[in-house]
């Protein structure tokens, strides 16, 4: 029988760009992929959507699995290029997440995944189409910094003004 529903299997995933401010620079959390395809490449944290969860619940699950505290996040874009994944049809929704460096505690040893913070001006070649997605996330972050008070989320209440100036210079070149 088959039918249209069986022919069009589609997977949804959330990809989370988690940013923080550290030593006057904006950093992005990436994780190293342990399996093919793109084994050894850095990628954005993400998970496939479960049938019984919303995208927002999925993002919260990703953040929780990383051992991070609850944080601000917002939906940025949806990527539906048919070549996003080689063997499956996957639609990815990207999220911009911000966390204050003082509240960070990565449970890396529990997750058994290699993670690292990268300066947004020094992002390596990433797996899949994640460089495109990261570019969109950084562009959105820059717009938010210019047009809102979103940077307050990245700093503890006792941050120094020169550090804020360094962040603006780093992000806005």
Pin down the residues of each PLM region:
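N-terminal strand-loop-strand
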Residues: 5-42
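Short, compositionally biased serine/threonine- and acidic-rich segments at solvent-exposed termini, linkers
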Residues: 46-47
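Conserved helix-adjacent loop modules within structured domains
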Residues: 147-158, 171
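A eukaryotic nuclear recognition-module signature that targets compact all-alpha binding cores
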Residues: 37-42, 138-150, 161
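Active-site segment of metal-dependent pyrophosphate-handling enzymes
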Residues: 6, 10-14, 27, 56-60, ...
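Short helix-coil junctions and helix-kink-helix linkers
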Residues: 166-173
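NUDIX/MutT-family hydrolases
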Residues: 96, 106-141, 154-165
